[in-house]
Amino acid sequence: MAISRLAGAARAAAPVSPGVAVGGSISVVIPARDEADRISPLLEQIVGAPGVAEVIVVDDQSADTTAAIAVAAGASVIAGEPLPAGWAGKAWALQQGIEAASSEWIVTLDADARPDPRLATAVVARADRDDFDFLTVGGRFECPTPATRWLHASMLTTLVYRFGPPGSATTPDRTMANGQCMTLRRDRFLASGGMSIVAGEVVEDIALARRLANDGWSVGFLDAADLLTIRMFESLGDAWTGWGRSLALPGVEPTSRQVFDLAVVLVAQALPLPRLLLGRGDLLDVVLLANRLGTLVGTRTAYDRADAAYWLSPLADLGSVSAIARGITRRGRQTWRGRTYG
């Protein structure tokens, strides 16, 4: 199962590259809650970028200077309304921003995104060329410490083992997405309910992609590492807590499939190396380890640097398995930036 998903990398769709602008203007929507420490690099690159008619920052009731920074950078700022019952914060912020936008095309970006100024026109051109109704793209990760890179690379690999790389063909109920950069046509999206169809989802990007795919939309998830860098986490602890919270895809994957995928990751990704090191491995473990190392070679372009910490990331695989297991078994409410969900 895992090997067949990895083999899909050879058949994956081509990455997004800079494209000629298509007809119709582009609005960039950025949901932001207490992002004063990291939103400036994004705004420096995207305000005034080619093809971008407006940049809308939805200030989701921040307690810091997010709004002032956005105004100073030339963005339009919307003061987010109080969170309605049944909504998660990001989905609500995106809904407000998309409703306020005036362009045919919407590109959403998270505050931790570091885009090439050509990104917006590139993703819109690709969506238009390939007739995607909804397109998300993955970027290149910037991990500021070796420890963060070590764990993050292992966690990313669990997604490749479970779902294949960006651009892989898949079924609607296994569709993947990256909510850090989404592209869609405003009017059709709002006519279909907008973010309200995933209002209460914590993993709203994948839930949205799967809902739209099941409704007959053409949904794409492609690589755009040459045009987008993401700085998600500042430390190993941040990665463990932040990504560990959603790595099991709570609310998106049924428990039975979560457990099955966990078993695939454990057997095919995490166990072969320790089994061989302990002298208990066999030929199958050798084959699986070779696949693991091949995957490591394949994902190196997803990181801003591939140093010793990156190449040693298979040693973190058992930790990544435990993060998925913890996500499957976690019960109760979760807190994020002063809000409690669940």
Give residue ranges: language-model regions.
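Acidic donor-binding/catalytic loop of UDP-sugar-dependent glycosyltransferases
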Residues: 65, 111-126
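A conserved acidic beta->alpha catalytic loop
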Residues: 45, 59-68, 82
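Membrane-embedded multi-pass helical conduit in multi-pass membrane proteins
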Residues: 258-333
